[in-house]
């Protein structure tokens, strides 16, 4: 898959995952309100949709290449000698 198509697919999957998570959270909240009279058995599906949305989000980040950039910067910030603060170097 070309880089442009992979990036587009990753962004679509991340967007779809976000929508699925928000809809799942929204339905879970609305299901708790008695005036809407929503079926209780859909509540389990709403909780499951939060996890499905998170998996879609992570898959999109992996396909689109966003995951590697975040990992690299986290690794550099925490473990690279050039970026770590040491007590030996103190500025006056």
UniProtKB/Swiss-Prot annotation:
Lineage: superkingdom: Bacteria
GO biological process: cellular response to cadmium ion; cellular response to hydrogen peroxide; single-species biofilm formation on inanimate substrate
InterPro entries: DUF2583
Pfam families: DUF2583
Protein name as annotated: Uncharacterized protein YchH
Protein's organism: Escherichia coli (strain K12)
Gene coding for it: ychH
């Amino acid at each position: 898959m070309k880089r442009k198509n992979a990036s587009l697919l990753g962004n679509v999957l991340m967007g779809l995952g976000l929508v699925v998570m928000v809809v799942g959270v929204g339905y879970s909240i609305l299901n708790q309100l008695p005036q809407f009279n929503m079926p209780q058995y859909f509540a389990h599906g709403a909780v499951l949709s939060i996890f499905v949305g998170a998996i879609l989000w992570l898959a999109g980040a992996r396909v689109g290449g966003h995951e590697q950039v975040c990992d690299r910067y986290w690794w550099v910030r925490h473990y690279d000698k050039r970026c770590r603060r040491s007590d030996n170097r103190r500025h006056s």
